[in-house]
Amino acid sequence: MSTTTCQVVAFLLSILGLAGCIAATGMDMWSTQDLYDNPVTSVFQYEGLWRSCVRQSSGFTECRPYFTILGLPAMLQAVRALMIVGIVLGAIGLLVSIFALKCIRIGSMEDSAKANMTLTSGIMFIVSGLCAIAGVSVFANMLVTNFWMSTANMYTGMGGMVQTVQTRYTFGAALFVGWVAGGLTLIGGVMMCIACRGLAPEETNYKAVSYHASGHSVAYKPGGFKASTGFGSNTKNKKIYDGGARTEDEVQSYPSKHDYV
């Protein structure tokens, strides 16, 4: 998969994940009434992070928001905080990833800058997905605990022969939406981090070459400029060599042992 394709797929997955997180946070069906023991009922109750609703058999639905903050369970407030943090980080990462797309050119932005922005958005998407998954999982754990506690309290008295009427809640649709959305955001963040490696410029290693200056020296004197190139010394040496060398005629003028034969 090319870098551009990986980046675009990660961007689309992150958009879907962020939209799912927003939808799950605003949904009212985080917990729904368990109808296992009473499938036919005139009232159906379900609750969300922000309000609780009651739907009657006639089709009329009445929702009542939570008018208190401090009176809510600590776990519910923690779930709210996790979902909000996940949405904020996902929105910031989405904004950064738009400018980091390789198929979009903004001025003279270098590939190294796009690589850094891609890595930043990928980390934000990963943290956003983890926050969403953690928030939904905490709420699900709270539902499971309350469900079994309510089940135990229903069969009390006379050796468990007397069954009391008590409302139990089970998983709502918002939990599954949140899990899927968090997973999509997490996958998008991982793919963004993978695409960052393709955008990073490759480092080129150059071999060091030693450079030696020429042997010509330049001498500076207060009286003026005089360049000493070394030709004078070479001329003198040449004259000495020429003076010491014998010409061919001079060599032949001296008698040798072969001349007397």
Curated annotation (Swiss-Prot):
Residues 28-80, 144-174 are extracellular. Involved in alveolar fluid homeostasis via regulation of alveolar epithelial tight junction composition and therefore ion transport and solute permeability, potentially via downstream regulation of the actin cytoskeleton organization and beta-2-adrenergic signaling. Required for lung alveolarization and maintenance of the paracellular alveolar epithelial barrier. Acts to maintain epithelial progenitor cell proliferation and organ size, via regulation of YAP1 localization away from the nucleus and thereby restriction of YAP1 target gene transcription. Coiled coil: none annotated. It comes from Homo sapiens. InterPro entries: Claudin, Claudin18, Claudin_CS, PMP22/EMP/MP20/Claudin. Residues 1-6, 102-122, 196-261 are cytoplasmic. It is a multi-pass membrane protein. The modification Phosphoserine is found at residue 214. This is Claudin-18. Residues 242-261 are annotated as: Disordered. Keywords: Cell junction, Cell membrane, Membrane, Phosphoprotein, Tight junction, Transmembrane, Transmembrane helix. It is found in: Cell junction, Tight junction; Cell membrane. One of its GO terms (molecular function) is structural molecule activity. Its main location: other. One of its GO terms (cellular component) is plasma membrane. Belongs to the claudin family. The chain crosses the membrane at residues 7-27, 81-101, 123-143, 175-195. GO terms for biological process: bicellular tight junction assembly; calcium-independent cell-cell adhesion via plasma membrane cell-adhesion molecules; cell adhesion; cellular response to estrogen stimulus; digestive tract development; epithelial cell proliferation; epithelial fluid transport; lung alveolus development. Residues 195-261 are annotated as: Required for role in regulation of RANKL-induced osteoclast differentiation. Interacts with TJP2/ZO-2. Interacts with TJP1/ZO-1. Interacts with YAP1 (phosphorylated); the interaction sequesters YAP1 away from the nucleus and thereby restricts transcription of YAP1 target genes.
